[in-house]
């Protein structure tokens, strides 16, 4: 409870919008579970809400520049991604800016070989995503009842992925395209 409250307060102070987490559960060294997650955008609309976000991660591998996600399980997720004019900013850009370094930094020399990322299993249940982009004229709403897969190969560097089976159920996508609005029209 204490960790959840500190994380929520820190995030709210950093990004300046409402952040709510009903429960945080960490089982070292592997599992992080968030339940009752809510994140508001600067217009006080829902940016992200979720019943359960569970990530099974090999935390000790982080010490050797490796992110190994054994299982990602998302349930009851709603995400609203919106881009508007005149600034053509997304409704989550303020979060990126809040965590970005305020001082310019010199390009570090890459001597580590980079961070490797691997994903084993993904399970998604009751996912709703709204993408409303006034700049490109795309308005997409998607609902996914269920999706799960297990990767045999996951190579982000080469964009090479192999999965023997994908289970997909209850996919409903609505796309509305309008003429893209140029900045000059504003």
Locate predicted features.
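Secondary-structure transition motifs
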Residues: 17, 36-186
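Generic alpha-helical scaffold signal
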Residues: 5, 26-31, 44-50
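Short extracytoplasmic
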Residues: 13-38
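N-terminal type II signal-anchor transmembrane helix
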Residues: 1-16, 78-80
């Amino acid at each position: 409870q204490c960790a959840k409250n500190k994380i929520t307060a820190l995030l709210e102070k950093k990004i300046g919008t409402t952040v709510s987490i009903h429960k945080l559960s960490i089982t070292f060294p592997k599992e992080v579970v968030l339940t009752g997650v809510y994140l508001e955008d600067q217009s006080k609309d829902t940016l992200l809400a979720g019943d359960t976000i569970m990530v099974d991660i090999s935390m000790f591998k982080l010490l050797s520049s490796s992110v190994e996600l054994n299982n990602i399980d998302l349930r009851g997720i709603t995400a609203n991604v919106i881009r508007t004019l005149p600034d053509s900013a997304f409704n989550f850009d303020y979060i990126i800016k809040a965590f970005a370094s305020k001082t310019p930094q010199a390009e570090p020399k890459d001597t580590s070989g980079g961070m490797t990322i691997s994903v084993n299993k993904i399970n998604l249940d009751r996912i709703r995503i709204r993408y409303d982009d006034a700049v490109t004229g795309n308005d997409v709403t998607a609902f996914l009842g269920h999706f799960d897969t297990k990767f045999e190969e996951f190579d982000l560097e080469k964009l090479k992925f192999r999965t023997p089976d994908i289970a997909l159920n209850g996919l409903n996508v609505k796309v509305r395209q309008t003429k893209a609005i140029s900045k000059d029209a504003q």
